[in-house]
């Protein structure tokens, strides 16, 4: 039986390319996206490339009950890849509550619903911003690189953003400690 993956934010640039790769590798894909940073025509492009139109649900993942209903309607999801997040550093400083609601509430909702639907894994797309400015000898940046945000102390600096992103990476182990083995650690895609 084919594995089924939920790609949250799957009509965005990275999400759509990930969907193509998953479908080409033989996975069934369900996309949930609110289309706030993309458009529905992306599904046509995915279908043109792979020959398969992925299942699509237009939904804001901050809506926990709506997310629960979507998961009920699409049983058998094995894992989630989460790209549904706001990502502009400058805007996150200007509108921190908007970013908190979108990025943190979405992640927490999914983590809380995963046990209910026996979804075992989640890949959380982070940001290279958590690493700060890497030393040239440490390039390319790898997922085990030290977190070293910018040193500027002002709240409006990218350091503030990188701290928020770094904290989000630790939520899975905090919210599901009984499901996290010693191997349950962050794997960043830089």
Model-derived features: positions:
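Hydrophobic, Gly/Ser/Ala-rich alpha-helical and linker tracts in large acyl-processing enzymes
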Residues: 164, 181-190
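N-terminal Rossmann-like NAD(P)+-binding domain of SDR-like oxidoreductases, especially those catalyzing
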Residues: 1-180
């Amino acid at each position: 039986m084919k594995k089924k993956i939920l790609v949250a934010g799957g009509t965005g640039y990275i999400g759509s390319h990930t969907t193509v790769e998953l479908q080409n590798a033989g996975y069934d894909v369900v996309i949930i996206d609110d289309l706030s940073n993309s458009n529905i025509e992306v599904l046509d492009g995915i279908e043109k490339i792979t020959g398969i139109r992925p299942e699509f649900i237009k939904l804001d993942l901050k809506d926990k009950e709506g997310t629960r209903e979507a998961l009920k309607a699409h049983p058998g999801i094995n894992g989630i890849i989460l790209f549904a997040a706001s990502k502009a550093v400058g805007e996150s400083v200007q509108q921190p509550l908007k970013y908190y609601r979108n990025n943190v509430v979405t992640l927490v909702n999914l983590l809380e619903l995963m046990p209910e639907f026996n979804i075992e894994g989640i890949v959380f797309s982070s940001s290279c911003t958590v690493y700060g400015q890497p030393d040239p000898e440490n390039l390319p940046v790898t997922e085990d690189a030290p977190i070293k945000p910018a040193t500027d102390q002002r709240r409006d600096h990218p350091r503030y953003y990188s701290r928020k992103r770094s904290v989000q990476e630790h939520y899975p182990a905090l919210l599901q400690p009984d499901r996290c083995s010693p191997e349950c650690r962050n794997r960043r895609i830089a």
